[in-house]
Amino acid sequence: MTADLLPVRRALLSVSDKTGLVELATALAARGVELLSTGGTAKAIRDAGLAVKDVADVTGFPEMMDGRVKTLHPMVHGGLLGRSGLDDAVMAEHGIGAIDLLVLNLYPFESVTAKADCSLADAVENIDIGGPAMLRSAAKNFARVAVATDPSQYAELLASLEANNGQLTAATRFAFSVAAFNRVAQYDAAISNYLSAVTATDTAVPVRAEYPAQMNSTFVKVMDLRYGENPHQSGAFYRDLYPVPGTLATFQQLQGKELSYNNLADADAAWECVRQFDAPACVIVKHANPCGVAVGAGNGDAYELAYATDPTSAFGGIIAFNKPLDAATAKVILDRQFVEVLIAPDYEPAALEYAQKKANVRVLRIPHGDGLNNFDNKRVGSGLLLQSSDNRGMTRDELKVVSKLAPTDKQFTDLLFAWKVAKFVKSNAIVYAKDNRTIGVGAGQMSRVYSARIAGIKAADANLVVEGSVMASDAFFPFRDGIDAAAAAGIKAVIQPGGSMRDAEVIAAADEHGLAMVFTGVRHFRH
């Protein structure tokens, strides 16, 4: 049975990150807590004018082997592992004093090995041995011992001591124990991933494989979801341990119903697409496919143009902006259509106030960030597919004109716009665009020519004029039929990767129809 409240009389502090150390030690000393410490931590505490006992004086052994051995001793681990009422006699027999609180963070292995010029020797020297051992001992004995692993926990620790007259609750000790075991697992995973990636050690800086022989990943649960992709499936949302700034996992929900599995999948597609653009842009997504994308003079202009691409599909969609959302645009959207999720880097106060009239609409703020996801993964039966993220951009200078007719400057602008959109449309993907807006989108067809036909049908349904538009294809055209369909619809320029066995036939079709065509040399499959 675990006692609910236990006093803290003796604490061991040993940290590599000195953030908040002196303030914590001062607060503990003010409560009469005896402080034990090691090396640089003890020096920092002494320099603050506080009394502290060196662990070497407790163990009777000096720190040795350049600090590799200092806490691996029964006087330390016995003090952490000793059980009240069970081990009291043994501890008294051997003069082991109980340690009630351990404050410890580990050598900075992750940050050291993140440096491109990190040597294997530096990596190895930053593998903490005594630290994880103490964390495990203290965390295992949460019935009597509390353990803090990060400066972010110090405020909660001190608040709990203050609220309970120098004692810590069982709930606090257990929560800190779980955090400690999680930290040790993360640390060991980082070491395993690093060493598993090392393929050569005969150079000053070891050669590391992009994909380690064994991979360990850590994710933190953000929330449980009402259900998964379908109501009969359960679901939850987890984020990376260290989310990339500017990505979906950094969102703040400002209002609305609980987010669903599909909401989050669609929101990610919409946000990643819209954040490609520098000018004000709007992306409307349905079932993870953009159904309308536009760049405009402002949010309102971009939204109107994106919405006009496919008003039917926009119903119940996810709408994302790359600029702070103004009240006027928010009012137009919410008065016109049913929206599942609104996304923007920020909102005018009046926009949020108006959104409250539609309390079920989920409103997300995702702060701007320049970071990009490095890897994508997909689960398959008992396995994982891992790849580098498709972050490949494209500039005009990289395009190769393969037709007799070269695109005009305006067509080049539209081609690059359509190419950005096509990257986020499920394959086979065809995008018709003109004047920095989508005219029609053909997505997810098994035949590329059918995607081209669907893009034309979508444009006609929305009463949009295809004549003079450009077409983007996420992959090469295996036959000329896609070009024939595009020309019949009124397309005047085409951007595609090239690389088909029938490229000559496809180029000839473009020349026959008087189309300009450029190759990117880059494919954007999306499944």
From Swiss-Prot:
The keyword Transmembrane helix does not apply. GO terms for molecular function: IMP cyclohydrolase activity; phosphoribosylaminoimidazolecarboxamide formyltransferase activity. The IMP cyclohydrolase activity resides in the N-terminal region. Belongs to the PurH family. Pfam families: AICARFT_IMPCHas, MGS. The lineage of its organism: Bacteria, Pseudomonadati, Pseudomonadota, Gammaproteobacteria, Lysobacterales. Keywords: Hydrolase, Multifunctional enzyme, Purine biosynthesis, Transferase. Its EC number is 2.1.2.3, 3.5.4.10. Pathway: Purine metabolism; IMP biosynthesis via de novo pathway; 5-formamido-1-(5-phospho-D-ribosyl)imidazole-4-carboxamide from 5-amino-1-(5-phospho-D-ribosyl)imidazole-4-carboxamide (10-formyl THF route): step 1/1; Purine metabolism; IMP biosynthesis via de novo pathway; IMP from 5-formamido-1-(5-phospho-D-ribosyl)imidazole-4-carboxamide: step 1/1. The gene is purH. It catalyses: (6R)-10-formyltetrahydrofolate + 5-amino-1-(5-phospho-beta-D-ribosyl)imidazole-4-carboxamide = 5-formamido-1-(5-phospho-D-ribosyl)imidazole-4-carboxamide + (6S)-5,6,7,8-tetrahydrofolate; IMP + H2O = 5-formamido-1-(5-phospho-D-ribosyl)imidazole-4-carboxamide. This is Bifunctional purine biosynthesis protein PurH. One of its GO terms (biological process) is 'de novo' IMP biosynthetic process. The keyword Oxidoreductase does not apply. Residues 1-149 form the MGS-like domain. GO terms for cellular component: cytosol.
